[in-house]
Amino acid sequence: MIKYVFIQNDPFLLPKVLDKYLREFSDTTAGVNIQSVAQGKRTVLQTAWDLYQLYGFNYFQWKVRRYIIKKLLAKVQNDILGSTKHCHSVAAVAKKYGVEVTQSVDVNSEEFLAHLRDKGVEFIVSISGTQMYRKKLRDQTAAGIVNCHGALLPKYRGLMPSFWTLANDEKEGGVSVHFVDKKLDNGPIVVQKRYRIHPHDTLEDVMSRSKDLAAEAIIECVRLVEAGDPPLLENPEDCSTHFSMPGPEDVRRFRRASHRFR
C-alpha cells in the first residue's frame, strides 16, 4: 500500500515521531508533505502572537530560543554538512530515509491532488497536520486518511489537547488515531492509547509523552489498515467536547491545577 505523510513543520518532537514511522514504512511511503505550524487561516506571525499571549514572556522566549537552536542545527548539521546522524527537522528525517519532501501550501489543490495520483497514493497519515482535508482528497485516497490527535477522543477535539487535559486536571491522557471525515476530529478510531498524568506534570512532560505514544499508535494503525478491515472504535459526536485557543482565565485554571508549562 503506497502511503503519504502530512506533518507539521515542528522541530521539537515530530522528527522523532517521523523517524519511528519511516523506520517501518519508508519503502512504501511516496512522500512527506510538510505543513506550516500556523493553524487554519492564521499566519505564522499571528500564531506566534497567539502563543505569546498564552504562554507569557518566560516560557515563550524559552521556546523561541530552542526553536532557533533547532533551526540552526538543522541548517548546519543536516543541510550544509549533510549529516543525518542527528536529525533536527522533519525534512532531515525524510532525507535520511530517501523519502521525497513537498511543501504544498494547500494539499487540497488540483495540482497536489494530481501529484498524489501520479504517485499512486492509497493511504495518507496525518501527524499534527494543520490543514482540513476536503472531500476530493478523501475520495481519491482509496484506503482513507488517518489523523493522530493528542487526546482520548471523543473528548478534547480541536486545538491544544495537552493543555486542556491538564487545565481540566485529568488523571489520564492519550492519543487517538482516527479516520478523517468532513468534521474536525470526528471519524471512527482505529487505535487509542493512554498514559497516566502525574500531579506535577508540566505541559512539556505531557506533550513529550503524547508524542512518544503517537509514534506507537500510528505504526499500529498502519499495520491494521494494511491487514484489511481494521476494528474500529466509535467516536460519537454527542459525547464530544470541543476546545479552541486558551484565554487568560484558562491559563489561570491551568496554574490552579498545580501545572506549569515547563
Indicate residue ranges for each PLM-predicted region.
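One-carbon transfer enzymes
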Residues: M1-R262
